[in-house]
């Protein structure tokens, strides 16, 4: 009985040895195995067993030349030849590698299968054992993350389209107690591309919805801002002196109301003042302080507290001007940021003191002029999606290609 058990163990070992060596020299692996391809060029295809036993998976099975030779001599595949001195092996010249044509690639693709649902700690041997009675599998590629962790899915190449189809169409397949997702490899990539397109569309829709929500919030904030400023606009007009400036207005109302913004340029005949509080109160106080005759540089002026739609439109324009001035200030700040003492632009800026904020019809604190400079914007280029199967990622292993 013990002898029968030993014989069974040896037969199982020999089968594994044959399977592993025939995989190394097989149609799928050999064209991709750079190291082995270099070896077979050295001696008419012969590779010393001394080299072969350095391949990790074969090494774990045996390093005994006699065991390897005995196993190959019993193989029904008749793929391998053994040298007369029994120290070298090679793929039989009578069974040349298939030419890698588009037709051949398409054939391999049609018998390639995607399987998902394995535990992430599953070993290749576990998966090979599970596939043993599912048809002849020529290659197993364990799909991994960038950090080499197993993703729980594989690509398996069957020996024929028929066996691959039979496997895919077998219902209710499980690995242990886990249901498996099984698809042809081509169908898997089609499904993934459809999912990517769907995700892209959903992302665009979410972005659009978020943008609309932001726009709505901005509009609500703008309306709230407008409501807070209702009654705070005072328009002035008349045959104003050409030298009339914002400082004149600040001086005129300095003790009667806090000015937040002046919409006016030197030489214009009208403008608008935005007060922090109600404009009528500031106007009444200023008139009272000037005996009812409120002038600018000894020129008669018509003063009008804006109301209704005219007021709202004027407020919107002022808010836009404020934002434009703020953006230009931020842009100029970025350009000057980090300038050294030797920089001419920095020296010029430091000589003038602080930067003044004034563009067309806009003003914060002074009447000095400044250049109008816009900020450049970077444009992101969208990545193009493809419906085609991406180039295969070669898994680096002990002998070059594949996981098997």
From Swiss-Prot:
This entry carries the following GO cellular component terms, namely: cytoplasmic stress granule; cytosol; nucleus; ribonucleoprotein complex
What are the Basic residues biased-composition ranges?
329-342
> A single Gene Ontology molecular function, please?
mRNA binding
Question: Know the name of this protein?
Answer: Lupus La protein homolog
Q: Which residues carry this modification: Phosphothreonine?
A: 120, 362
Q: Where is the xRRM domain?
A: 227-348
Q: Which GO terms describe its biological process?
A: positive regulation of translation; tRNA processing
Q: What positions are modified (Phosphoserine)?
A: 92, 94, 225, 366
The scientific name of the source species is: Bos taurus (Bovine)
Q: Which residues form the HTH La-type RNA-binding domain?
A: 7-99
Against Gene3D superfamilies, the record matches this protein to: 3.30.70.330, Winged helix-like DNA-binding domain superfamily/Winged helix DNA-binding domain (1.10.10.10)
Q: What is the annotated quaternary arrangement, including any partners?
A: Interacts with DDX15. May interact with RUFY1.
PROSITE patterns referenced in this protein's UniProt entry, alphabetically: HTH_LA (PS50961), RRM (PS50102), XRRM (PS51939)
Q: Which SMART domains match?
A: LA, RRM
Q: Which residues form the RRM domain?
A: 111-187
Keywords of the record: Acetylation, Nucleus, Phosphoprotein, RNA-binding
Q: Name one Pfam family in it.
A: RRM_1
* Claim: Cytoplasm is one of the keywords in the record: no
């Amino acid at each position: 009985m013990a002898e029968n058990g030993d014989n069974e163990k040896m037969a199982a070992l020999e089968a594994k040895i044959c399977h592993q060596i025939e995989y190394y020299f097989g149609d799928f692996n050999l064209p991709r195995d750079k190291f082995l391809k270099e070896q077979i060029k050295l001696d008419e295809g012969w590779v010393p067993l001394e080299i072969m036993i350095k391949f990790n998976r074969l090494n774990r099975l045996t390093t005994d030349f006699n065991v390897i030779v005995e196993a190959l001599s019993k193989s029904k595949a008749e793929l391998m030849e053994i040298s007369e001195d029994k120290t070298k092996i090679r793929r039989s010249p009578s069974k040349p590698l298939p030419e890698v044509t588009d037709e051949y690639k398409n054939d391999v693709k049609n018998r390639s299968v995607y399987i998902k649902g394995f535990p992430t700690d599953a070993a290749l041997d576990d998966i090979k054992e599970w596939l043993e009675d599912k048809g002849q599998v020529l290659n197993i590629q364990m799909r991994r993350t960038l950090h080499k962790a197993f993703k729980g899915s594989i690509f398996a190449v069957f020996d024929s389209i028929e066996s691959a189809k039979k496997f895919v169409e077998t219902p209710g397949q499980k690995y242990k107690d886990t249901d498996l997702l099984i698809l042809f490899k081509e169908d898997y990539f089609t499904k993934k591309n459809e999912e990517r397109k769907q995700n892209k569309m959903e992302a665009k829709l979410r972005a659009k919805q978020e943008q609309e929500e932001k726009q709505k919030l901005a509009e609500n904030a703008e309306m709230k801002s407008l409501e807070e400023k209702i009654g705070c606009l005072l328009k002035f007009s008349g045959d104003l002196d050409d030298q009339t400036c914002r400082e004149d207005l600040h001086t005129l109302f300095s003790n009667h109301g806090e000015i937040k913004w002046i919409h006016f340029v030197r030489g214009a005949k009208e403008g608008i003042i935005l007060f922090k509080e109600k404009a009528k109160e500031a106007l009444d106080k200023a008139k009272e302080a000037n005996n009812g005759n409120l002038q600018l540089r000894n020129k008669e002026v018509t003063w009008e507290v804006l109301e209704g739609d005219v007021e709202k439109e004027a407020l919107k324009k002022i808010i836009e001007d404020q934002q434009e001035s703020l953006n230009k200030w931020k842009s100029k700040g970025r350009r000057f940021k980090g300038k050294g003492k030797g920089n001419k632009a920095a020296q010029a800026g430091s000589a003038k003191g602080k930067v003044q904020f004034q563009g067309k019809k806009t003003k914060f604190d002074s009447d000095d002029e400044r250049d109008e400079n816009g900020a450049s914007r970077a444009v992101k280029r969208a990545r193009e999606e493809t419906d085609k199967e991406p180039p295969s990622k070669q898994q680096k292993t002990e002998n070059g290609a594949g996981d098997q």
